[in-house]
Amino acid sequence: MQFSKMHGLGNDFMVVDAVTQNVYFSPELICRLANRHTGVGFDQLLVVEAPYDPELDFHYRIFNADGSEVAQCGNGARCFARFVRIKGLTNKREIKVSTQSGRMTLHVMDNEDVCVNMGEPEFEPQKVPFRAQKVEKTYIIRAMERTVLCGVVSMGNPHCVIQVEDIKTAEVESLGSVLEQHERFPERANIGFMQVVDRNTLHLRVFERGAGETQACGSGACAAVAVGISQGLLDRKVKVNLPGGSLSIEWKGTGNPLYMTGPAVHIYDGTIQL
């Protein structure tokens, strides 16, 4: 099986063309491939499939390193867009794809950065999903024998966003791992820790569902900005600084899609015996 290794701000991916190759990924195989000592090693596996709808270009599937399939990955979407162009699967700069959570439009810019239309943030608790009676800008969750204040939103996948004073000392591993599996998130959640620098800048670390802390999380950056804007902390265009680099996020508010722009890097191509 042929594959490419790519990364978006250090969030790394194994990308496979399932349009021209006949491949099947069991959870066991994915775990084996994800192993950084005995496999390829990655945060997520991205699979390019033929479209189910003639109006679209491709179907985009995402699997975590633990074998679970997820509906969204923003950094992966940027790599997906560059991969299909590098491999000659399309020469379009505007690429329309379906995912488990809906449709996305990916735009490859002249400098090879990719702008992704991530759709409109979803704050309705049942659609996140999150157990709550009604929409709130801030929720209170009990965890680790204390109360945690957070914003909750779906960007095609569930996110919990916590504001912190100092990103360096944020309890990403300890609190993140507890909240990821909290009973109020029936499908688990990605946990973001954001430090607001000013109205156009924030620092962010994310404990990703099924992957732990990663160098960057595109949908997590989108979620943090959506929550920050809804709470009145941020303006509509924000630079998000993650451990692996920076993303530009823009959202004009309710009724509008959110846009994420950032790099996607092709590292190498490989072949592996399955």
Swiss-Prot record:
The record marks 159, 208 as: Could be important to modulate the pK values of the two catalytic cysteine residues. Its main location: cytoplasm. One of its GO terms (cellular component) is cytosol. It is found in: Cytoplasm. Coiled coil: none annotated. InterPro entries: DAP_epimerase_AS, DAP_epimerase_DapF. The record marks 268 as: Important for dimerization. Keywords: Amino-acid biosynthesis, Cytoplasm, Isomerase, Lysine biosynthesis. One of its GO terms (molecular function) is diaminopimelate epimerase activity. The active site is at 73 (proton donor), 217 (proton acceptor). SUPFAM superfamilies: Diaminopimelate epimerase-like (SSF54506). Homodimer. Catalyzes the stereoinversion of LL-2,6-diaminopimelate (L,L-DAP) to meso-diaminopimelate (meso-DAP), a precursor of L-lysine and an essential component of the bacterial peptidoglycan. This is Diaminopimelate epimerase. The gene is dapF.
